Amino acid sequence: MIPIRSLLFAMILLFPFCLYAQNGKRDSVTTERNKFISNMTDGVIELTDDVATVVRHTGRKIRKEVKDFNAIDTLYITPNLYNLAFMLEHSTWHEHYQLGNNAGTESQYLNFSPSLGTKLGVYFGWRWIFLGYTFDVEDLFGGNKNKTKKKEMSLNIYSSKFGIDLYYRKTGNDFKLRSINGFHQDFKELQNIQFDGLKSTINGVNAYWIFNHKKFSYPAAYSQSTNQRRSAGSFMAGFSYSQHKISFDCEKLPASVLQQLSPSLRFNHIKYSDYSLGFGYGYNWVFAKNWVSNLSLLPGIGYKKSRIDDNDFKDESWIKDINFDFITRAAIVYNNAKYYVGASVVLHTYDYRKPNLSVTNSFGTLRIYAGFNFWPKKEFRNNME
């Protein structure tokens, strides 16, 4: 048996070595932990650097794409030199409807249109975005309290390569019967009488591509965001989609007209959707310094899916659902980069035809405006000093 005194003596001798071993193990764990944390930190920093690099690269690529997308030939087009714009506008709205029965020599046609609507507007713009407020001139003088107000909303985007038109129109009840044709007697005495039996709603979108965008500028003629320096033209291709709802109460026609009215014109509601592909041409004519005039025509072939009086209108041949649409634009502008004044007209025409019924509706806007640009862009400030 080992004496207790010897055992105690051995434990005292081994105690420092036990402490050293424990401290060594603890130091090893601490070292491993610090190494792990260091690796994690380095990994996070490296990942952050990679993300920042990707973001910078993506940002540069996007800026390059935008720059290339809006590239222009500066011999033909001068870019907008300012950030902000202020504009006053006078606009006149027009619409027209022709209803016909397509019965050969017995064809009947009724033409309706309201009085021209006039509005005044104030606009504030940042680059190519314009926001403003318009009001009806008749409202300033009281107007007709019983008249249902029209609703017109539109958004036009004119860039160097493409353009987009978004619009919504809802007519009031102030139509007039402008002409009556194809009846057995002359109804000249009924021309221009008030007719509140016609209402319509139209909403849609037009999108078009400009092929010669480096030399031909739509914004120069319609949004004053560039200046056309030399005459140039371009072919254009476009697509449009629109929905049309027409309500017609023939019972509100004069009795003498209603008595002879064809059965195909005694409908109550027409609803149709129009899908159209178009191809046309536009030309900017620079006829004097800082002056440009534009004329563009974009005819289209449209397919129309219709519903009459809540019944789907089906025909044996789909080719009979193919009709023609037309978009016309014209403008004249004076723009010296700082101040501008001009006028423009945009006219939409839609043609709907079935074996016994036709509806041709058109609407357009005449704008007369004046304004000025301010706050020069950073890249052009030195050239203006």
Residue ranges of model-derived segments:
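Sec-dependent signal peptide cleavage junction
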Residues: L19-P79, K378-E385
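Outer-envelope beta-barrel architecture signal
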Residues: N80-F86, T118, R127-I129, S160-I164, ...
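Residues that define the transmembrane beta-barrel architecture of outer-membrane proteins
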Residues: Y82, P114-L120, K147-K151, Y158, ...
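Residues on the lipid-exposed face of transmembrane beta-strands in outer-membrane beta-barrel proteins
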Residues: L88, L120-W126, Y133, M153-S159, ...
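Surface-exposed strand-loop-strand hairpins of Gram-negative outer-membrane beta-barrel proteins
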Residues: W93-K119, F130-N146
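Extracellular/periplasm-exposed beta-strand and loop segments of Gram-negative cell-envelope proteins
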Residues: Y109-S113, G117-K119, L177-N181, E189-N203, ...
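Outer-membrane pore/translocation modules
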Residues: S154-H269
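Outer-membrane beta-barrel "beta-signal"
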Residues: G204-A207, S362-E385
